[in-house]
Amino acid sequence: MDFKVADLSLAEAGRHQIRLAEYEMPGLMQLRKEFADEQPLKGARIAGSIHMTVQTAVLIETLTALGAEVRWASCNIFSTQDEAAAAIVVGSGTVEEPAGVPVFAWKGESLEEYWWCINQIFSWGDELPNMILDDGGDATMAVIRGREYEQAGLVPPAEANDSDEYIAFLGMLREVLAAEPGKWGKIAEAVKGVTEETTTGVHRLYHFAEEGVLPFPAMNVNDAVTKSKFDNKYGTRHSLIDGINRATDMLMGGKNVLVCGYGDVGKGCAEAFDGQGARVKVTEADPINALQALMDGYSVVTVDEAIEDADIVITATGNKDIISFEQMLKMKDHALLGNIGHFDNEIDMHSLLHRDDVTRTTIKPQVDEFTFSTGRSIIVLSEGRLLNLGNATGHPSFVMSNSFADQTIAQIELFQNEGQYENEVYRLPKVLDEKVARIHVEALGGQLTELTKEQAEYIGVDVAGPFKPEHYRY
């Protein structure tokens, strides 16, 4: 079995953590019981790219328990929990003779190593992957752009304004084109569908669909209610504070905090800081979200207006160029800057890392002080990447049980219903969304009210649901 992780000797520690996480992930454990005999993913060869955490380990072993074969990489260079990666590789075997799942992930990958790992999840020897499970869209992008450049016969050269990450991506595609011509086209034809975990990846999917280059059906897991309204908000509310505490031990009470973005993730950020006693301001482009922030009690400002007074600045937009180098120069001495959007381009990290008039001092892994020519400095977490995974271990198990149950159900839906979906982007059917919610309500001891037949008819629903129309916003 091929794999590449940091240290297989960490497998026992990882297994203990996985065992504890299983008790906090009732959605996945229920799916294992429900589908144990049916094996709905038998024959599925899943190329998986999600943060290689303890919670993801429970997802991987759920997929294999339902019959799938899996190869896995992380979707972030800093997010891997090395003990979890080791435990998944060892599986039911030993450190000397591992018998688990091929994993290609370790904490602190270089950009070149990251894209090498992504390529490995698509390398199945004589077979081809037939499903993709993605977070952020990098794996899907590799197939789509890889096929495009194969057809052109050339991977284009990097342009002057391309990010270091995109340059590394093109380098990987160039190497594959030389060594394995035709690889990506074959994979594009073999894949039955992709399920996408996060907002950024979903934006990419819709873009590919609009371009007419999406070669297989896609399931938008992010916009399942049991994902976006729970993982994005409640998970962030927990893991953001965890990441900052582990990174800096900074007291948040009384501090001025600027949260950029007030979507579901931004709402979780603002609520988390508010709960710590911080004074929170929000930036937002969407007037509806801005009005929500105001009604929730937060000032709505612009970055330029608020950044000079902020002790902590967090980006949560899923967009690019949110905090410029010029704005960083205006920040307080030793102010904290972090990001909880999927990519590192919300903050102008390129200037921080490449300008001659900026000095970088690493305080500890994923905590860096950048000193400007003025003598002032700022503290940046995880090089502008997801701080809750780079500086901590991500969202708690229970909330990830929601998201990963959605992922598992979406994989089953696409794999078993080949031909019923066009090469477009779909959302998880609401009846399945409600199924995931029901499992977790019961796990928390909640008692659901049962409608009478007359009540159900009165509001135009079935007694067993779904209870809301597709357009309902919750």
Curated annotation (Swiss-Prot):
It is found in: Cytoplasm. GO terms for molecular function: adenosylhomocysteinase activity. Keywords: Cytoplasm, Hydrolase, NAD, One-carbon metabolism. Gene3D superfamilies: Adenosylhomocysteinase-like, NAD(P)-binding Rossmann-like Domain. NAD(+) binds at residues 198-200, 232, 261-266, 284, 319, 340-342, 388. It catalyses: S-adenosyl-L-homocysteine + H2O = L-homocysteine + adenosine. It is an enzyme of class 3 (hydrolase). Its EC number is 3.13.2.1. Its cofactor is NAD(+). Binds 1 NAD(+) per subunit. InterPro entries: Adenosylhomocyst_ase-like_sf, Adenosylhomocysteinase-like, Ado_hCys_hydrolase_NAD-bd, NAD(P)-bd_dom_sf, S-Ado-L-homoCys_hydrolase_CS. It comes from the Bacteria. SMART domains: AdoHcyase, AdoHcyase_NAD. GO terms for cellular component: cytosol. Pfam families: AdoHcyase, AdoHcyase_NAD. Pathway: Amino-acid biosynthesis; L-homocysteine biosynthesis; L-homocysteine from S-adenosyl-L-homocysteine: step 1/1. Belongs to the adenosylhomocysteinase family. May play a key role in the regulation of the intracellular concentration of adenosylhomocysteine. This is Adenosylhomocysteinase. It comes from Corynebacterium glutamicum (strain ATCC 13032 / DSM 20300 / JCM 1318 / BCRC 11384 / CCUG 27702 / LMG 3730 / NBRC 12168 / NCIMB 10025 / NRRL B-2784 / 534). The gene is ahcY.
